[in-house]
Amino acid sequence: MAETIRPISKIELRFKLADIKKPSSQIIVYCNSGDSKRFDLIGATERIDNKSEPFFNTTINIDYYFESVQKLYLLAINHNLKTLDFTKIDQLDVVGEFTPTIGDLISRDGKRLIGDIKDKDKITGKIEITAEEIYETGHNIILQLKGTKLDKKDLFSSDPYFKIYKSSPSGNSIVFESSVIKNNINPIFDPIVIRLQELNGGCMFRELTFEFWDHNDIVDDELIGSFRTNTDEILSGIIKEFPIINQKLKSKKSNYEHSGIINFIDSRILYKPTIQDFINGNGNGNGNGDGNCLIDLMVAIDCTESNGDQKLETSLHYNVKPHQNQYIRSLLALESQLLNNFGVKLEKRVEVFGFGAVINKHPNHNFRFHYIIDDRPNTLKAGISGVIELYDKAIPKIQFTSPTKISSIIEDATRYSLQDFHSTQLKYSILLILIDSDITDYESTVDEIVEASKAPLSIIFIGVGEYSFQNIPQLDGEKNGNIRLIGRFDRKQIRDNVHFISFKEFSINQIDFQNEILRKLPNQLTEFMEFKNYLPNGLSYTQTEIKKIK
């Protein structure tokens, strides 16, 4: 067996463009390794409008393999759409491209590289890339700041906010910007939670700069002052007060003392729990009780006519032994991953939805499989074996139709995921959607996914058959450049809760297919729990004594 090559660290990339003529700029990052000719989408910056020299706050993290040649394909694009599929480069409005290697980047002084971006050999602007090697800690840090007697930059008061910068060989990099507090020279800012590696790259003694500004609606914001410190100094609590210094005022006034005082009224390291911490708690759980996080599963099966006549061997639903179709293989792969990777045995009956069938002489896009065989839900077997038994009984009786709609099933799944969910008994649900073509209710589906992002639910699409999917991949944050979906009334997806997998891409290697199915689940579950401020066994951060790490 070949040895798995592990990254030695992560590289954090920051970007700046110059001399750009297009109104809306964004950078998409692709990467390959070694002799691979395929560039994989890594991520994207935010979009910045109406700036010829945009500096992007969004950082892109890439695993760094010392022994491999890792080529970057950086694409500067212009767009003003809500969503784009960044995997389809030919559909993007390209400003220019740049193709360095990570090795070339980190070998430069200050790990800073400036180059020309080109479109069809024509220079269309410049790009500046700054790299930093960071070390993952698995922790977050919570900070809350209180200001006292800040300078009055307006007639009677100030509208203060602050920025945090971390030092680097190429200069300071911004890591956080707070919201503005109106008309208050004694502000108490909201608590902030930052990943420790983003704040200091894993170094507790790295210099941090806190800048305080007065916001103005018409003229430029005005600097109140700043101070420097490091994470260790903040957490130790030795320094109780940090004077804000405005160097310009200090040089002009002989009696100048400071422009205000800052206190850290809260500063703690928050251990970031893993999915295993939630499922197993203190090690005595099985993912199905004991006060730990329950894992619940729902399955939705495509019953549209594009599957083909289920009695024929050419049908995607043909499932006569020894033949095992892609629907069944996907179900078994999911069961295997839940048990082997997370120790979860599904001991409850799994709800099975169908969509795209004729029910009572009408197309139905949200029905329950047990109704097809006139069976009571409580008589069915638990787990995936129950799903397969129900599938084998129901599929021969179903009349397939069209179109393909799944939004109402996601709506129901969201509602089910919230049932019996509370802080003393956590539960997280998975909706597995097995589908053979793109959806026709895309906008409604986006709306429901946006709502589902606030619920304890992950949505996994597995595309079966030979269809080349177009719109479903755009629902997956990894495939659209980590752009959050936007639904009705400009409601925004708060986290990436969707994963799309095409079965045919893994038809040769079933092990890779199994590993891919639940690859995103750990981050999706822990991100939701972090959003809700829950710790394993239902404790919240405010209820838990967390030791400071020095």
Curated annotation (Swiss-Prot):
Pfam families: C2 (PF00168), Copine (PF07002). InterPro entries: C2_dom (IPR000008), C2_domain_sf (IPR035892), C2B_Copine (IPR037768), Copine (IPR045052), Copine_C (IPR010734), VWF_A (IPR002035), vWFA_dom_sf (IPR036465). This is Copine-F. GO terms for molecular function: calcium-dependent phospholipid binding. One of its GO terms (cellular component) is nucleus. Residues 1-115, 123-246 form the C2 domain. PROSITE patterns: C2, VWFA. Belongs to the copine family. Keywords: Repeat. The lineage of its organism: Eukaryota, Amoebozoa, Evosea, Eumycetozoa, Dictyostelia. Residues 296-521 form the VWFA domain. One of its GO terms (biological process) is cellular response to calcium ion.
